[in-house]
Amino acid sequence: STGIGLIETANSWLKKTSSSADNFEIIGLEHLIGAMANNAGVLLVGMHSSTLDLCGAVLSNHVGFDVMYRRNKNLLIESIMTKSREKNYPNAIQRDDIRTVLKNLKKGHAVWYGPDQDYGRKHSVFVPFFNIETATITATARFARISGAQVISFTHYRRDDDSGYVIGLSKP
């Protein structure tokens, strides 16, 4: 699974994702489209898993959204990832640029945000994630409250039989 994930990630960085869109089922796209129609901004809350880059790029072909990211320390990988972000998303916002995140949400953008990171005890709480106590960032509710954005859960996975991918979007 990890090997497949690396290939999927490389494909999303280097190839056009529209060519493989037939292998994707998007459940709940109408929730994101409806929320975007209100121009209130949408916080797309997701998780970091091996299908993130590929499924995110495919979803962005349907509804463009901004992404938050952490700069990679390896300059070659960062360069490749930057080109991919520029190709697949309207805006890529560094994780510590909170003003831009809030400004874009207030303008009615959708912004992908992954709270499944450990930024230390001051900014995290430990909650069960697949029955394992895991650090989770607590800023999600503050982002939504300050910006007035609606929150939509964005899930994605590869089908067990490797026949394709499922992207899920919750109701706000």
Per-segment meaning from a language model:
Residues 1-43, 78-89, 159, 167:
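Membrane-anchoring hydrophobic helices of lipid-metabolizing enzymes
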Residues 5, 38-96, 121-130, 158, ...:
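Catalytic core of membrane glycerolipid acyltransferases/transacylases, capturing the structured
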Residues 27, 96-97, 135-139:
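Short, conserved clusters of charged catalytic residues that mark active-site
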Residues 28, 46, 115, 171:
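Pocket-edge structural micro-motifs
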Residues 31, 96-101:
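Short acidic active-site motifs
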Residues 40-46, 109-113, 149:
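Generic beta-sheet signal
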Residues 73, 110, 117, 121-172:
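A cross-family acyltransferase "interaction/gating" segment
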Residues 100-106, 145:
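Short acidic alpha-helix that forms the nucleotide-activated donor recognition element
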